[in-house]
Amino acid sequence: MLLELARWLQQLESLFGLFNYLTFRGILAALTALFLSLWMGPAVIRKLAQFKGGQPIRQDGPQTHFSKAGTPTMGGSLILLTVTLSVLLWGDLRNRYVWLVLAVMICFGAIGWYDDWIKIVRRDPNGLKSRWKYLLQSIFGLAAGLFLYYTADVPAAITFYIPMFKAIALPLAGVSFVVIAYFWIVGFSNAVNLTDGLDGLAIMPTVLVACALGVFAYASGNVVFAEYLKIPLIPGAGELIIICSAIAGAGLGFLWFNTYPAMVFMGDIGALSLGAVLGTVAVIVRQELVLVIMGGVFVIETLSVMIQVASFKLTGKRVFRMAPIHHHFELKGWPEPRVIVRFWIISVVLVLIGLATLKVR
């Protein structure tokens, strides 16, 4: 019987060989995360609803948002769970980048979980005090930057590149590299969090950007593609396509429940962690500026808040009716679904522009 089993397995050698292909495992990671999200989603939402404390609604926000009171939050826990399970199942667990990105996701997710918990228990829309939130984010962001710098095994891994000007390469010293890594990880963590103010607004751009970063990761880890496209070759970076694919699958699964009108909100546990992951992957594959392009919706949302605060402090006047800017359009009379879909369209265009930089030289 064992001989027959051995012969049968030998016939399946070509099938098992498929698992050596990153693209194949990436597809499986996405599908696994997607189906896990769809399967576990209803149970997770019911569990979150038992807290009897949905996302607190801003009293100065659009009147239409008061109908959202009581909607369960912390739905990002579903994303983190399904992404982690999918990556552990399909990822190469010998790859240091896989463990780093998972660690960043979990650490920033823990900050978001505590922030959400305060909002629910204390009914405080502000959640965790900003200084403590930024302190924890800074600790984890700096730790990730230091890890990447001291484990870099090729000069390209600590060199700053400018898209479309691929002959320009700026070697980074320790401090400058860590500072850039810190700002991108912490910055995009907060940028995604600011964007997460309407049903499905943040998760779809996150899915799109994750897919594009997966393409960059795959190309950066492949000698042939990296040379042909004139992008930095980062050994081991290709494995990040598994994480990016898992995020895309989990994000689509979450969107099934988060689309307007939302059955559950992502909460800070999802927004902070996903933004940090996008920033970390961009730093690893040396595509920081491309992330600024592809994640333009997140950047615009963040800039709108900065402009609003600066204008009010300097002149006492507001530039926008309300910040982040998606609320400005709501107060102008745009229905929420219109704001959401138009921001999605902008994200699609920006992601395509970012992908085009692969060929533009």
Curated annotation (Swiss-Prot):
Catalytic reaction equation(s): UDP-N-acetyl-alpha-D-muramoyl-L-alanyl-gamma-D-glutamyl-meso-2,6-diaminopimeloyl-D-alanyl-D-alanine + di-trans,octa-cis-undecaprenyl phosphate = di-trans,octa-cis-undecaprenyl diphospho-N-acetyl-alpha-D-muramoyl-L-alanyl-D-glutamyl-meso-2,6-diaminopimeloyl-D-alanyl-D-alanine + UMP
EC number(s) per entry:
2.7.8.13
Q: What class of enzyme is it?
A: transferase
> GO biological process: any one?
regulation of cell shape
Task: Supply one GO CC term from the record.
Answer: plasma membrane
Indicate the transmembrane segments per the record.
25-45, 73-93, 98-118, 139-159, 168-188, 200-220, 237-257, 264-284, 289-309, 339-359
Report keywords, A-Z. Cell cycle, Cell division, Cell inner membrane, Cell membrane, Cell shape, Cell wall biogenesis/degradation, Magnesium, Membrane, Metal-binding, Peptidoglycan synthesis, Transferase, Transmembrane, Transmembrane helix
The protein's topology relative to the membrane is:
Multi-pass membrane protein
Q: In which pathway does it act?
A: Cell wall biogenesis; peptidoglycan biosynthesis
GO molecular function annotation: metal ion binding; phospho-N-acetylmuramoyl-pentapeptide-transferase activity; UDP-N-acetylmuramoyl-L-alanyl-D-glutamyl-meso-2,6-diaminopimelyl-D-alanyl-D-alanine:undecaprenyl-phosphate transferase activity
This protein's cofactor list reads: Mg(2+)
* Stated role: Catalyzes the initial step of the lipid cycle reactions in the biosynthesis of the cell wall peptidoglycan: transfers peptidoglycan precursor phospho-MurNAc-pentapeptide from UDP-MurNAc-pentapeptide onto the lipid carrier undecaprenyl phosphate, yielding undecaprenyl-pyrophosphoryl-MurNAc-pentapeptide, known as lipid I.
Q: What is this protein called?
A: Phospho-N-acetylmuramoyl-pentapeptide-transferase
- Origin organism lineage: Bacteria, Pseudomonadati, Pseudomonadota, Gammaproteobacteria, Lysobacterales
